[in-house]
Amino acid sequence: MYTVDNTADHDECMSMLADAGIYLALDVNTPKYSLNRGDPGPSYNKVYLQSLFATVDAFANYDNTLLFFSGNEVINDDKTTPAAPYVKAVTRDLRQYIGSRGYRKIPVGYSAADVESNRFEMAQYMNCGTDDQRSDFYAFNDYSWCDPSSFTQAGWDQKVKQYGDYSIPLL
């Protein structure tokens, strides 16, 4: 789910999803509160973090909340790569917040744009550091395997080889 209203009551929806066996993967950012990829420093502030924490509070107690994305395609080209430390800080802050509130361990990670020039470096960066700093998982949005394509035409054979020893789950 890309965005939610963290002030609304989601009990009915989450109950219907649970009844259907559906788990929620939720981006905690919203159109109003998100990192500005071009100039992330000013957007990473107390008001922004409080919005993210409100989203965690709204969804952490649902058993079918599967995971939280700390960001989605914030880094979408070489020019926006300097936003990476801010995404990593959001991951850290969310993990610490979840722990401090006594919520169950809910995985937090990043969903990346499939930018060939920094794809692997971003995956490595999000997986380095202390347990509090690094992602619980790493996802990348890859649209290369669209019909008519194949495992090799889409380049997935090379991706599987490159990420073969990656130590956190890839989504």
Feature map (PLM): residue ranges:
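Noncatalytic carbohydrate-binding groove/subsite architecture in carbohydrate-active enzymes
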Residues: 80-171
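Aromatic/His-enriched, Gly/Pro-containing loop or helix-boundary segments
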Residues: 32, 36-38, 47-54
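Acidic (Asp/Glu)-rich catalytic clusters
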Residues: 10-24, 54-64, 125-133, 160-165
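Hydrophobic faces of well-ordered beta-strands that scaffold small-molecule active sites
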Residues: 1-2, 24-28, 66-70, 108-110, ...
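Acidic-and-aromatic substrate-binding clefts and catalytic sites of carbohydrate-active enzymes
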Residues: 1-11, 33-35, 43-46, 76-77, ...
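Aromatic-lined substrate-binding rim segments of carbohydrate-active enzymes
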Residues: 1-40, 88-109
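Solvent-exposed, polar/charged alpha-helical surfaces in well-ordered, non-transmembrane soluble domains
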Residues: 15, 50-57, 63, 85-92, ...
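Active-site groove signature of glycoside hydrolases
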Residues: 53-83, 109-111
